Amino acid sequence: MARGNAPRDSYHLVGISFFILGLGTLLPWNFFITAIPYFQGRLAGTNSSAETMGTNHTSPTDTFNFNNWVTLLSQLPLLLFTLLNSFLYQCIPESVRILGSLLAILLLFALTAALVKVDLSPGLFFSVTMASVWFINSFCAVLQGSLFGQLGTMPSTYSTLFLSGQGLAGIFAALAMLMSLASGVDAQTSALGYFITPCVGILLSIVCYLSLPHLKFARYYLTEKLSQAPTQELETKAELLQADEKNGVPISPQQASPTLDLDPEKEPEPEEPQKPGKPSVFVVFRKIWLTALCLVLVFTVTLSVFPAITAMVTTSSNSPGKWGLFFNPICCFLLFNVMDWLGRSLTSYFLWPDEDSQQLLPLLVCLRFLFVPLFMLCHVPQHARLPIIFRQDAYFITFMLLFAVSNGYLVSLTMCLAPRQVLPHEREVAGALMTFFLALGLSCGASLSFLFKALL
């Protein structure tokens, strides 16, 4: 089936569905972070949020170092299960992986919500919470890898929509934090609301996924691509043909993607035997390794300081009043998530640098390492070793704006470029591999956050 015969995405329903699925994949992580005041209250042995809502989340009274541990234990299972998902995704049916993960996340969040009404000692509550974080993020890893694999077979616009949905999850979490601060409700009420909200979001994600087989546009890319006629012409872009010959992995007509333009005048290479089979993970890795490395470095920088360091920054105002209470939720969490979402959305309009700029992309990614010392030298009252150089609030706000936009844009850019660097039948593997490297970057950043916090 030629690309010109592809059906339209009526009412943008497929795009909306992937946007909501992207939202659902990051709701668990963001709502655990949003509920930090509740967790701090429980770990301090109190059910009242009156005192913990306005405190610094990483102050010396945080004996459990909750912020760092919840970040690390969210990313380690993501790394482990994404690795398994990258190599074993062909062994388990796609629908089982996606739907099963969504149902498991929903069940675990329901159990987490139930714990709000259960009295536990701080140590036991911390252990149960960390176990819940581990298992929820394990299923999130399988879910993300499977969905990115699907997106690898579709136009890059849908990858951008999915990533934008993930960015919106953080905005919801930040707004929930602000409403909780402004409402003055007790910790149990706010925590119950936190954990019911992602349950509703996961239910909506399940509905969206179940609706995809009933949408003609989704069937064309996700189902009918597997049953193309054997006489279908091969993709004939010169660079793809050269890459095919270089790696010795001939593409079969059954594996040709309907998303790319076909040249009716080009004949298949007669000397190349068409061998059915699944694409090699290592062949795909050789094609996308530089883009994957850039993705790792982007998230390493981001998670090494956010939120472990950035959440410690406070206003330098001599009489902060309410601004002191809302400074970090607005200037750290809300600003980051809004600008990160904006950065992810920019790739809907342009992709720069593109796949032909092999040196420029790594340079831009490496420049982000400058944000680590910049944030560490901001107004952090708990400084013991480093001086405070960037004392004014405007410095922190400017750094956060650039930090967040660059994170969102470079993440979305690398995820969109990777499928373009491989053959059509290798795109699903490329999507799964990029998800693994995404998790690797998150884990590296979460681990480094302990070191950078100790250096303060």
Curated annotation (Swiss-Prot):
<keyword id="KW-0597">Phosphoprotein</keyword>
<feature type="transmembrane region" description="Helical">
    <location>
        <begin position="192"/>
        <end position="212"/>
    </location>
</feature>
<dbReference type="GO" id="GO:0035340">
    <property type="term" value="P:inosine transport"/>
</dbReference>
<dbReference type="GO" id="GO:0015851">
    <property type="term" value="P:nucleobase transport"/>
</dbReference>
<dbReference type="GO" id="GO:0015207">
    <property type="term" value="F:adenine transmembrane transporter activity"/>
</dbReference>
<dbReference type="Pfam" id="PF01733">
    <property type="entry name" value="Nucleoside_tran"/>
</dbReference>
<dbReference type="GO" id="GO:0001504">
    <property type="term" value="P:neurotransmitter uptake"/>
</dbReference>
<feature type="transmembrane region" description="Helical">
    <location>
        <begin position="432"/>
        <end position="452"/>
    </location>
</feature>
<dbReference type="GO" id="GO:0015211">
    <property type="term" value="F:purine nucleoside transmembrane transporter activity"/>
</dbReference>
<feature type="transmembrane region" description="Helical">
    <location>
        <begin position="360"/>
        <end position="380"/>
    </location>
</feature>
<dbReference type="InterPro" id="IPR036259">
    <property type="entry name" value="MFS_trans_sf"/>
</dbReference>
<feature type="transmembrane region" description="Helical">
    <location>
        <begin position="13"/>
        <end position="33"/>
    </location>
</feature>
<dbReference type="GO" id="GO:0015853">
    <property type="term" value="P:adenine transport"/>
</dbReference>
<dbReference type="GO" id="GO:0031965">
    <property type="term" value="C:nuclear membrane"/>
</dbReference>
<feature type="transmembrane region" description="Helical">
    <location>
        <begin position="69"/>
        <end position="89"/>
    </location>
</feature>
<dbReference type="GO" id="GO:1904823">
    <property type="term" value="P:purine nucleobase transmembrane transport"/>
</dbReference>
<dbReference type="GO" id="GO:0016324">
    <property type="term" value="C:apical plasma membrane"/>
</dbReference>
<dbReference type="GO" id="GO:0005886">
    <property type="term" value="C:plasma membrane"/>
</dbReference>
<comment type="function">
    <text>Bidirectional uniporter involved in the facilitative transport of nucleosides and nucleobases, and contributes to maintaining their cellular homeostasis. Functions as a Na(+)-independent, passive transporter. Involved in the transport of nucleosides such as inosine, adenosine, uridine, thymidine, cytidine and guanosine. Also able to transport purine nucleobases (hypoxanthine, adenine, guanine) and pyrimidine nucleobases (thymine, uracil). Involved in nucleoside transport at basolateral membrane of kidney cells, allowing liver absorption of nucleoside metabolites.</text>
</comment>
<keyword id="KW-1133">Transmembrane helix</keyword>
<dbReference type="GO" id="GO:0005326">
    <property type="term" value="F:neurotransmitter transmembrane transporter activity"/>
</dbReference>
<feature type="compositionally biased region" description="Basic and acidic residues">
    <location>
        <begin position="263"/>
        <end position="275"/>
    </location>
</feature>
<dbReference type="GO" id="GO:0005337">
    <property type="term" value="F:nucleoside transmembrane transporter activity"/>
</dbReference>
<feature type="transmembrane region" description="Helical">
    <location>
        <begin position="161"/>
        <end position="181"/>
    </location>
</feature>
<dbReference type="GO" id="GO:0032238">
    <property type="term" value="P:adenosine transport"/>
</dbReference>
<dbReference type="GO" id="GO:0015862">
    <property type="term" value="P:uridine transmembrane transport"/>
</dbReference>
<dbReference type="GO" id="GO:0016323">
    <property type="term" value="C:basolateral plasma membrane"/>
</dbReference>
<keyword id="KW-0472">Membrane</keyword>
<keyword id="KW-1003">Cell membrane</keyword>
<comment type="similarity">
    <text>Belongs to the SLC29A/ENT transporter (TC 2.A.57) family.</text>
</comment>
<dbReference type="GO" id="GO:0015210">
    <property type="term" value="F:uracil transmembrane transporter activity"/>
</dbReference>
<feature type="glycosylation site" description="N-linked (GlcNAc...) asparagine">
    <location>
        <position position="56"/>
    </location>
</feature>
<dbReference type="GO" id="GO:0035364">
    <property type="term" value="P:thymine transport"/>
</dbReference>
<feature type="transmembrane region" description="Helical">
    <location>
        <begin position="288"/>
        <end position="308"/>
    </location>
</feature>
<keyword id="KW-0812">Transmembrane</keyword>
<dbReference type="GO" id="GO:0035344">
    <property type="term" value="P:hypoxanthine transport"/>
</dbReference>
<feature type="region of interest" description="Disordered">
    <location>
        <begin position="248"/>
        <end position="277"/>
    </location>
</feature>
<dbReference type="InterPro" id="IPR002259">
    <property type="entry name" value="Eqnu_transpt"/>
</dbReference>
<dbReference type="GO" id="GO:0015213">
    <property type="term" value="F:uridine transmembrane transporter activity"/>
</dbReference>
<feature type="modified residue" description="Phosphoserine">
    <location>
        <position position="252"/>
    </location>
</feature>
<protein>
    <recommendedName>
        <fullName>Equilibrative nucleoside transporter 2</fullName>
    </recommendedName>
</protein>
<feature type="transmembrane region" description="Helical">
    <location>
        <begin position="123"/>
        <end position="143"/>
    </location>
</feature>
